[in-house]
Structures are given as C-alpha cells and as structure tokens.
Amino acid sequence: TSFSKMLNFKLKKLKVKKNIFLPFGYDKYLHRKPNLKKKTNTNNKINFVGAYDKYRENFLNKLNIKIDVFGPGWNKMKKKNKNINISSGMIDGIKLSKINNEYSISLNIMRKQDLNSHNMKTFEIPAMNGLLLTRRNTEQNTLFKENVFCYMYKDYKELRKKIKHILADSTKAKIIRKAAHKKVRQFSYDNRLKFLLSNLL
C-alpha cells in the first residue's frame, strides 16, 4: 500500500498474508532542484501549489494570511480574499521547481483522507528544494522528522505562529531545507521500485 500505513493494519485483520507499506515518493527527473545560473535568496513569501477544491478554498480563507496560490481551477473562487494571490492554470515541472525553490515556505494542505498519513507533496516539495510546512502526524514525522527536515503544525493557530517563526529565522529554515533535500533522495521512485522488487522476488 502507499496511501497510508493504516491500510496495512486493515489488510492484516483481513488475513492478507503478505502486504508491504510503500509510501509515495518523487520522480527524480521531474521533481528536482532548478538549475539556476545565479544563486537566489528565498523571497520571504508563502506558496501553495495544487488544484482548486472547496476544502482548500475554505482552508486558505480561514488561515487568512498572505499567500501565493498556483494551480488549475482557482478562478472558481466566488468570494475573493485580498490575502490570496491566485495564478490559476496548469504548472509545468520547471515552473513548479522554481516556485518551491524561491519561496521561503511551501505549504502542504492535507485533505481529510490524508490527515493521519502523507501525500505526494510530502516528498515532492523537499525534492525540489522547497521548505515543507505540513500538518503534524506520526506517519509524516517518521518520514521527515519535525524541526530537522520540515516544519509541522496542528491547527490554524499554530500554523500562523509557525509561519512567523520560520520567516523570522531564515538561518534555521535554510538548514532544514538543505537537510530535507538531502534526506529525500532515498525516497525516489527508482528506490521505491528497488525496495518493492527486493520484497517480491
């Protein structure tokens, strides 16, 4: 399984003899640090990249902080929020990589089904040299230890506080970003395939 480790426990209850927890990963040819001629500093801003849905709209409206949003479908928002700067449309791999590399924070909004597990952005953001800010849960903390490879939050109050903390301490944020970019290499889909084959053959 890849969606959540909890599925493995359910499979065991169903007496499935062999099951393997294989989390998502990243494509090393697509999700990579951009090849920039000049070294750039982060822009002291926050981004979220992803397709529009009502849950994400409500999340960002409730958070109510300045954030740049990229992805298809965001022109569907009926009520405009002055703090949400929208660039609606598809994002190619090169632009996606530049966004994650340039911004001080890349926010990962976990959907309801992911709240206690992980999603693709858990790996893709650090692979592109982004600084991952994601919801706190055991599964993600096992993959990327909090305050070592990423930042985590529990609720809106802590999320706002954590954003201020990250922007105020760029030195620590830079260390965490670099450590995560190195750590994530073991989670490429190439390595996932090697692991799977070693357990099946």
Each model region followed by its residue ranges:
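Short, hydrophobic/aromatic alpha-helical segments in well-folded domains
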Residues: 7, 121, 162, 179-180
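Nucleotide-sugar donor-binding catalytic core of glycosyltransferases
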Residues: 1-146, 195
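Hydrophobic, well-ordered secondary-structure elements that form the walls
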Residues: 125, 150, 180
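Catalytic phosphate/metal-binding cores of nucleic-acid and nucleotide-processing enzymes, i.e., regions
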Residues: 156-159, 176
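Conserved acidic donor-binding segment of nucleotide-sugar-dependent glycosyltransferases
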Residues: 150-156, 165-170
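Alpha-helix C-terminal capping segments
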Residues: 58-65, 153, 184, 199-201
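A charged, aromatic-enriched C-terminal amphipathic alpha-helix characteristic of glycosyltransferases
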Residues: 168-200
